[in-house]
Curated annotation (Swiss-Prot):
Residues 49-153 form the FAD-binding FR-type domain. It comes from Scheffersomyces stipitis (strain ATCC 58785 / CBS 6054 / NBRC 10063 / NRRL Y-11545). GO terms for molecular function: cytochrome-b5 reductase activity, acting on NAD(P)H. It catalyses: 2 Fe(III)-[cytochrome b5] + NADH = 2 Fe(II)-[cytochrome b5] + NAD(+) + H(+). The keyword NAD applies. Keywords: FAD, Flavoprotein, Membrane, Mitochondrion, Mitochondrion outer membrane, NAD, Oxidoreductase, Transmembrane, Transmembrane helix. Its cofactor is FAD. The gene is MCR1. May mediate the reduction of outer membrane cytochrome b5. GO terms for cellular component: mitochondrial outer membrane. It is a single-pass membrane protein. The chain crosses the membrane at residues 15-38. This is NADH-cytochrome b5 reductase 2. It is found in: Mitochondrion outer membrane. InterPro entries: CBR-like, Cbr1-like_FAD-bd_dom, FAD-bd_FR_type, Flavoprot_Pyr_Nucl_cyt_Rdtase, FNR_nucleotide-bd, OxRdtase_FAD/NAD-bd, Riboflavin_synthase-like_b-brl.
Length: 298
């Protein structure tokens, strides 16, 4: 029976007053709900094909080839609209009229209002990374999205291992940050992160702060190719022997996430075929008995 028919029948009975009160209550609930929704932060990015130009607020060096950039969202109270873990597409038009489009993962909190942060490494011959590095404050860059890579749910797994290299740290950092900011999420996190030198370890200050604050939940091991005398981490690549000793056992309660340059994928998990095709699992993880279901490649 529909609500309108039920209401009509009751309106002619001795229950008019209670029903009227209920109707008032319903109207009040509707108003309150609408007010609550209206008070939610507006989202700068809602999906679809619309490109949004964001103004660069600041840009500073993290290393000799990597910058931290902060862009201004359209309104000061806007949040990005992204979830963990997702990315935005970026676009600029060359002098000859060609579109250059590349994906980038923000490193800022999904609830951060007014601005959005990126860590971008400049690659030799990289059109977008070179363009972004040349941007000056008040310049704009076009963005579109979000595009969800893996939607994190609290306590999805008992433990996760994150294997990364270079700027592949960005979605892995998203995961660590999202998990540790939620006291109800008890997921155990291990990060194994490789860089060329100690100075090339990106957002190390932020990573170390999270590990120190959540020392019973987060474990981080850094690897560098070239170490100096003061280096206290691991030297060399992330080997199969290291993974065998430090990864959780294969199983549905554990998940491994991989993100980094092509040599890392080749050695650890095998490459993706495309953004929507994870490809076969090969490399160290396959040799250690993990299956495709145990591993996600960003």
């Amino acid at each position: 029976m529909s609500f309108s028919r039920s209401f009509s029948r009751l309106a002619s009975s001795k229950f008019v007053l209670p029903v009227a009160a209920a109707a008032v209550g319903l109207a009040s609930y509707s108003f309150t709900s609408s007010s609550f929704i209206a008070n939610e932060p507006s989202k700068a990015f809602k999906g679809g094909d619309e490109w949004i130009d964001l103004k660069l607020i600041s840009s500073h060096d993290l290393s000799h080839d990597t910058k931290h950039l902060v862009f201004e969202l359209p309104n000061k109270d806007d949040v990005s609209g992204l979830v963990t873990a997702s990315l935005l597409m970026t676009k600029f038009v060359t002098p000859k009229g060609s579109n250059v489009i590349r994906p980038y993962t923000p490193v800022s909190d999904t609830e951060q209002a007014g601005t959005i942060d990126f860590v971008v490494k400049k690659y030799e011959g990289g059109k977008m990374s070179s363009h972004i590095h040349d941007l000056k404050p008040n310049d704009t860059l076009s963005f579109k999205g979000p595009f969800v890579k893996w939607k994190w749910e609290p306590n999805q797994f008992k433990s996760i291992a994150l294997i990364g290299g270079g700027t592949g740290i960005t979605p892995l950092y998203q995961l660590i940050h999202e998990i540790t900011k939620n006291p109800a999420d008890k997921t155990q996190v291990s990060l194994f992160y490789g860089s060329q030198t100690p100075d090339d370890i990106l957002i190390k200050k932020e990573l170390d702060a999270l590990a120190a604050k959540h020392k019973d939940q987060v474990k981080i091991v850094y690897f560098v190719d070239k170490a100096d005398a003061s280096w206290k981490g691991e030297t060399g690549y992330i080997s199969k022997e290291f993974l065998q000793k430090n990864l959780p056992a294969p199983g549905p309660d554990n998940k491994i996430f991989v993100c980094g340059p092509p040599p890392l994928y080749k050695a650890v998990s095998g490459p993706k075929v495309s953004p929507t095709d994870q490809g076969e699992l090969t490399g160290s993880l396959a040799e250690l008995g993990f299956s495709k279901e145990n591993v996600f490649k960003f």
